[in-house]
Amino acid sequence: MVKTERMQVEEADQTPGNAWLVGLAAWFIPGMGHLMQKKWVRAALMGGAVWACFFIGLAMGGHMYDLSNGNSTSSTLLQVPPMIANLGTGALFIISWLLGVGFAEDVVQAARVTYEYGNTFLLIAGLMNYLVMLDAFDIAAGRKS
């Protein structure tokens, strides 16, 4: 009897394979994980919030972080946490990096009044998308409705 209970617990802990695909899609394109599950309102609200934060951050002149602009090891290490936060936006980060949008080391851009607000919006967009991704993953895994 104990053996069957243990097997049931192990089976309950198994994550369906499509949950990983949904999670990856949700990270890569904000809101896509919920769209794949036909959760239209969640996709519009959660994905839309990430997209809006990202583009508002860019419009305010925010700076996206990567590892290439540090001169010393200590300054490079300090850029890792914000880079991980920015990387949370998935394809938005990758496309911005490829186009060079938001990565400029410009003194004029840094002097803008809205520069720090833009940085904050960009960081929040990435962190929020991590939460949206986990929500889509949990729904696909059956842990949440």
Stretch-by-stretch model annotation:
Residues 35-45:
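Membrane-interface helix starts
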Residues 2-23, 46-145:
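Transmembrane helix recognition focused on a "late"/terminal membrane span
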